């Protein structure tokens, strides 16, 4: 079991203006200094997450309020009334039961917290379970970039972490099913084609540079079927696993049988399932409770594109061929990779053990070699009772909410991401069509990163070559080398007769 299984729970989230381009668990070697922050009891200005300086996204919050709970003219978000949040904050389960029928439980307050965030941070288990029973969103993040699940891990109640994890999986499955009809319709309208692209991974960490892979991927699309051939089986947690792999999506099959992965070397296949056993869920909870809590975003607030230049004496815009396509090269400016790590829920033993694991992985080792087996974790002792009043909380300045829950131990790292992108007007495929194809093959993590990156507002054309962040210390250069329309034999979208099923061949898919 690796961290990839945990990260896979978050794959269908759409990026916001500050792109959630890196999932939790991915900041293996980012720098920074841990800072412990406590409560400021005798001040009207409360400092929450002092080390975290990333502002909230006012536009996103405003849009959310407009959709869910309109604010009357002349009323600011700070002055807005949040009755569901208030009764959760005060632990009024009876009033919550009444309000839940007529009010949105997904609304964010002026600190970006939903009622579920507050219930978890304050340890109000009754309120939290009631909200979950009414399908309160688990994936949503507050202004500091933390989800209710992240806050639950910090609080340390195992039962609550498990309940949130199960609900998150359920909501992820439902989201996939909701998208399926639209996705199939888009694929059907798209012509049949063959697409070849190349991945080249780099890092500024010397030890990592030696073990980073490259990969040539071939994508076949016919009707509502897709096949992806790749040599990169697994690329997570600072390690990579090579092989001869094919991923097949059959749009005509039942959802439970749509996705199949073939191991062409061992001649076995595995269907990608969404249901997990009780033991698998418990193991994931153990890993969550013994690992750092991560939040990483690629801030695009200040993004801009300038034409790349070529020539020594006489400078001119850079235009050259990428594969078969003429492309204009642009420099990507203003991208900042922000990563945060929390570990207030960990013991010194946990921290030393995790550090040893990451050092081994950075040198080319893997979890299997270390006989890694998560230890069954018990609930932590609850943090001291909350002393902040509702009035103090809701009237605090945006982005400076008084801290609720366990005292923070947090580290932040910011890194400017320098990138180049080549846009071609000649490429036959549009970005929207590419997004639909990439959404199908999102179980492969690096493809999910590509999908999220190209959703940004790019210069005109199709991105035939681009640099994207995959992990905080690792980037990838993706090159679209070949594209052609054509028809293919049905056999390439089916499981060969001599392949045998192995349900456990790819445990992280």
UniProtKB/Swiss-Prot annotation:
Residues 1-42 are annotated as: Disordered. Residues 1-19 have a biased composition (Basic and acidic residues). Pfam families: Ank_2, ANKRD13_C. ANK repeats lie at residues 79-110, 111-140, 144-173. Keywords: ANK repeat, Chaperone, Endoplasmic reticulum, Membrane, Repeat. It is found in: Endoplasmic reticulum membrane. InterPro entries: ANKRD13, ANKRD13_C, Ankyrin_rpt, Ankyrin_rpt-contain_sf. It comes from the Eukaryota. GO terms for cellular component: endoplasmic reticulum membrane. Acts as a molecular chaperone for G protein-coupled receptors, regulating their biogenesis and exit from the ER. This is Ankyrin repeat domain-containing protein 13C. The lineage of its organism: Eukaryota, Metazoa, Chordata, Craniata, Vertebrata. The gene is ankrd13c.
